[in-house]
Amino acid sequence: MKHTLALFLKTGCVVCIFLLLCLAAVHHFKPALSSLPVFSRFERKLPIYCVDTDKPQVAISFDAAWGNEDTETLLSILDKYNVKTTFFMTGGWIESYPEDVKKIAASGHDLGNHSENHKQMSQLSSDECLAEIQKPHDKVKELTGTEMTLFRPPYGDYNNTLIESANALGYYVVQWSVDSLDWKDYGADSIVDTI
């Protein structure tokens, strides 16, 4: 019994000494730890997903990055129902279909920027982000006179560097709150069920 009590007291003393050393170490190194960038006040910047309105509304948008085979039909349907949307266009699409860009603008739809080359924007430097945003901006301005202010990053891929770069060029970075998954080509019924 004496042996068990002595072992218990020794173990308790060792644990107490260890805890005191840990507390002393934390207290001693606390100022150094708080000055490390890892412990800085890093704030993740977020794009716009939705906005508050006085009445229930839906914002519809389209990404124009590859073909234009449905553009005329789409514009006709939107016109028939007096619906205005935003078309987010890549630089390549703008170059390939300048007349469509003009028609979209003339129909009263918003023109949005979807980057020059549809790259993973979070993998780019600030200078590369600026170039990816500025090039399509200049193309649309030359074609339509429109100063675009909305940027949708390809793949929904963003980071602080992208958002800061876009903001520096006068852009708001916007995403979506509902993805129709139309790009998976599941058909109209699937799209309706999704949204």
Regions found by a protein language model. Name each.
Residues 1-9:
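N-terminal Lys/Arg-rich, disordered targeting/topogenic segments
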Residues 4, 21-24, 108:
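A general, composition-driven signal for non-globular sequence regions
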Residues 6, 15-18, 49-52:
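N-terminal non-cleavable signal-anchor helices
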Residues 10-27:
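Hydrophobic membrane-insertion alpha-helices, especially the h-region
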Residues 25-35:
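Hydrophobic single-pass membrane-insertion segments
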Residues 34-121, 132-139, 148:
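Active-site beta->alpha N-cap acidic-glycine motif
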Residues 73, 95, 119-195:
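Catalytic domains of cell-wall/extracellular-matrix polysaccharide-remodeling enzymes
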